[in-house]
Every structure is written in C-alpha cells, then in structure tokens.
Amino acid sequence: MSNSLGKLFQITSFGESHGDCVGVVIDGVPAGLAINVDEIQVEVDKRKSRAKAHATPRCEDDRIEIFSGILNNFTTGAPICLVIWNKNIDSSEYERTRSKIRPGHADFTGFVKYGGFNDFRGGGRFSGRITAGHVMAGAIARKLISTIGIEVIGYTAELGGIVAKLPKTKDIRQNISQSDVNCPDLTATKKMLALIQQAAEEGDSLGGVVECLGLNLPVGLGEPVFDTLEGELAKAMFAIPAVKGVEFGAGFEASRLRGSKNNDPFSIQANHIRTTSNKCGGVLGGISDGMPLQFRVAVKPTPSISLSQPTVNIDTMTNTSLEIRGRHDTCIVPRAVSVVEAMTCIVLADLALRAGMIPRVIKQ
C-alpha cells in the first residue's frame, strides 16, 4: 500500500474503519507554529453530519489525542502524531455478508490485491473513516498556510442534480454555517435536504459536487512538469474515497469554447498582474497565477444502499443478491467538504514549503 503524501509536508495515514484507531503522522512541519488541540478538533468536528437526514447512525466522539510533535501549543519540528480512537464499532453486518462483494465498493479489488487478507470490516483501509486522519493533518496545514495569508473554502455546489447558485465570495462562509449540507445557497439547501430524505426513505443514496476555493495564493506554487499544482491536487482528491472526477476552472466546458472565449486577459490591478476572468481556475502551466484557485470534485452516490443488488458470492463463485443493512450515510457530499478542504491545505502547505515561501522556523 502507498499511505504517504507530500515531499516536505508529508503525511502518513494509518488505521482501518473497524480497527482500534485512525490517525496520521505529519513530517516536515516547521517548528514554532502555534497550534492547539481545539483548533484541530474544530476541523474534525466539521467532518460530522449536521442533519439526521444524511447522517450515519455510527456516531463517533472523534476526540483527538496528540502523541508527539506539539509542546505547550507550539510545533517542535518533530513528527506530529495524531490519533482518534474508534469506539462505536459494529462489525456484525460485515461478518454476515463477508462472502458477498458489495457493488460500488472496493471489496472485490481489495480481496484480489491483498489475497483476501485485507480488513473487510467497514471497508477497512478503503473506508471514508480514514479521512479523519486527513482532516487532522489538514488542520495543521491550514494553520501553516495561513501564515502567508492563504485561505481555503469548500462547499457543496451540487447534490443529487440540485445546483447551488453561488453568492459573492465574502458571503459564502457565512451562508455555509447556516446550511446543514454545507451549501452557500440556502434555498437550494432546503431542496437538497428534502431530496436526501426522499432517497433515504427509498433505500437509495445520492452524490454531488464539492467546489473548493484557494484565496490569496502567491504566484509560483507548483513544480512542473510532474508535480504541478493541478496534478498534486488531483492526486490528493482521488485519495478521498468516492471521488470520481476533478476539474479546474472552466474544466471540461473549456473544451467547447474557442480560444478567444477561454483565454483570461491580463491587466494591471493594484500594481499586480492579474487576469480579468478566471477560466483557468488560478493555474497556468501547472503554477498558481495569483488569481483564486478554483476546482470542483465529483463525489459518487454512497454505494451502501438497502435496495437489493445483484452480486457474486466470492467463496462459492455463484451469482447472488445483496441487501445492505449496516449503518451508512444516504449522502456523503456534505461531509466530504471538510476532507476536500483538508487535502487542499495539505497540498498547498507542501508546495509552499518546496517553493521556499514558508520558513523552517515560524517566528511569532
């Protein structure tokens, strides 16, 4: 398995869905960064469901424990180890259906890849549960990039085909705080919640789109040709279970435009070179151009549904059917927002360190 991401700001994820714990080790964090457990806990708590309609019945406390790397609320420069203990575990449903591979999950590929020795309970290493570690690391990264003024905002842009109308950037964060699905369009929020409730009653699930903005990025983040800003972000996004697509700026829409319509004209704005539009999503040649970073992440419907689905009994090699009765979300899109934000912060922290924009010791 490959469980590490990043070069200078490097995270190593560990744990399984129904194991003792999930966690992360973070290497390369500069010494002297002011951070306390409450700041990390705030980010982890954002990952929890706010509305019963789309919430998993598995309610974990998710209290963070700091094992190393932080002393008296400052980073020491040593590896930071953060852990969350799994306490609310029920593996009975997975034991009952162990021989039946779940459609849409990694049961089949994981079984073949690891010879049947992989932890199948709750999806094991393939579960969204492991993203709790990503979010803890993202909290450290968020604090680090804030020292050079970078801010990251994510939100639900689409859910079950309902598309949000986006307000001005300055209003997005306030509106998100009032939405149970992390959507800045409060009218769309009501429709999304109703649709989630309907899907839950039908035993089905929903997907959607998370949009993410990176504000105040300096020009120069990204290491062409193989560690571009887009490339590193895309790799990080695809490490999130359920992500099936990523597009930057105009994305696939750009393929339908002429160059005269797709190009972002340059101009001088407040003594800085900027563009008058942002179809490139803040990235040119794999390098940040000083405009807002903007990209979208497609999240598939939760594959665990209670409807009967055709599948295979991997022990007897016969066709069969499966009805999943476990504890699952109807829609994970609202919860994925915090994970997308976290992974974005991690990538930006790594690239900022590689570009020499953040010192190895943070002086207050």
From Swiss-Prot:
Protein name: Chorismate synthase
Function as written in the Swiss-Prot or TrEMBL entry: This reaction introduces a second double bond into the aromatic ring system.
Keyword Transmembrane among UniProt keywords: no
UniProt entry tagged with the keyword Transcription regulation: no
Catalytic activity: 5-O-(1-carboxyvinyl)-3-phosphoshikimate = chorismate + phosphate
Subunit record text: Homotetramer.
The entry's keywords: Amino-acid biosynthesis, Aromatic amino acid biosynthesis, FAD, Flavoprotein, FMN, Lyase, NADP
GO biological process, one term: amino acid biosynthetic process
Organism of derivation: Dehalococcoides mccartyi (strain ATCC BAA-2266 / KCTC 15142 / 195)
EC number(s) given by UniProt: 4.2.3.5
Pathway: Metabolic intermediate biosynthesis; chorismate biosynthesis; chorismate from D-erythrose 4-phosphate and phosphoenolpyruvate: step 7/7
Residues where FMN binds: 125-127, 285, 300-304, 327
CDD domains registered for this protein in UniProt: Chorismate_synthase
Known cofactor(s): FMNH2
Co-factor: note: Reduced FMN (FMNH(2)).
Gene coding for it: aroC
CC terms in the record's Gene Ontology section: cytosol
